[in-house]
A protein has these predicted regions:
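Extracellular/lumen-exposed scaffold segments
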Residues: 1-199
Length: 199
């Protein structure tokens, strides 16, 4: 209990899980699907990730669906509590061609998929997202304006960037009917511009 691992944009500390599948057969691509993270502090650093347990569903794209598949997946990861421990593991999986059948892990997988952020505007009721960036002598600001068919109640908004943005507290302003929110992420220029983060 209490062990943590990291989201795809981990924040100030840690690193996300990384995978390679070089020695696989009939595998074109493997994509990690990331459940909605939580924010936590560890060793004085604010990060985004998961606590105690998490399942990362994998989306595997085959080169030919009518051929047998052998997955040789190498994973590197980091888990933290009072200390951080890096680790690695290799997973082997044979996927025969032919009729598809449900496995004993089907319900666990469905549960994990239900924890993924909804990227479908139609099912999430989000109509529009505008992204703006500003900066002055002190701060660089990423602003999101989100419009929805339904009212927002305590939304959680996380920024993903391949450039390793630090985690900062965002401010949220609501329209009178709570169907439009404006949220600002303010980054200290010393943390952003000096490291050449593109905004």
């Amino acid at each position: 209990q209490g062990w943590k691992t990291y989201w795809k944009s981990p924040g100030d500390g840690g690193f996300a899980q990384k995978m390679t599948w070089d020695n696989s057969t009939n595998v074109k691509n493997v994509n990690i699907l990331w459940p909605t993270p939580i924010e936590f502090e560890i060793l004085g650093l604010t990060s985004l990730g998961y606590e105690n347990d998490v399942i990362f569903p994998l989306e595997i794209e085959l080169e030919d669906e009518f051929k047998n598949t052998f997955l040789n997946l190498h994973v590197t990861y980091l888990i933290c509590k009072e200390v951080c421990i890096p680790g690695d593991a290799t997973v082997f999986l044979e996927i025969p061609s032919g009729e598809k059948k449900l496995t004993n892990n089907y319900f666990e997988l469905e549960k994990a998929l239900s924890l993924l952020p909804d990227e479908d505007f139609n099912s999430s009721y989000v109509n529009k997202i505008n992204l703006n960036t500003f900066y002055d002598d002190k701060d660089s600001i990423i602003q999101l304006i989100v419009e929805s068919e339904k009212s927002f109640f305590s939304p959680k908004i996380f920024l993903h960037s391949p450039f390793g943005l630090p985690v900062v507290k965002n401010t949220i302003n609501y329209s009178d009917d709570n169907k439009i929110i404006t949220t600002n992420f303010n980054f200290d220029n010393d943390l952003i511009l000096d490291k050449n983060f593109p905004l």
